[in-house]
Amino acid sequence: YFTQELSSHDFIWYGRYPNSTEQFAGLQYWVENGGDLLAKLPAVNSAVVEVWQRDISIPDGESYSPGYVIYMDCKLDEGVTTDEVYNAYYAYAQAAKKEGDNLGRKIMFPVTGAEGYDHDFLIVMYANSLSDYGKNNDLWWDKIIGQLPEQQALAEVGYSCENRRSYTSMNIK
């Protein structure tokens, strides 16, 4: 998710877990048992990127395939901290949820392996399914855009995002 060279990648492996305990249990299982699966995949693992991430919101319900994920590269304005952005985004997500929003949102920070990445963080938005994303998109236009003070506060906190890109996703178990 830190690359501009999408044509050079067959897929992006994105692990989605409800918390760090399950994330690292999944990683342990992969390290101990994933070699056979990796050998069968019709692709070459060209990069491993480690990120720290904080959940802003988690969608209710089950995750179905196919899903939908959006990434945006973001930079902080001078003197603004990631905690300020997170807190404003969290307040906005909670207000949007009261209106019926059910998107998952994360703020992600590259730690290792993201060569050439010159942004401070990523914003990630995802839905449990393609149809759920459609419902949330309609909700955005009908009830949220320009109507929530928390959205205005988020817009004024002091950061900018670019390079919005979206992917479909599928569950692999």
Q: What do the predicted segments below correspond to?
A:
Residues 1-173:
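Short S/T/G/P-rich N-terminal loop/turn motif that feeds into the first structured element of a domain
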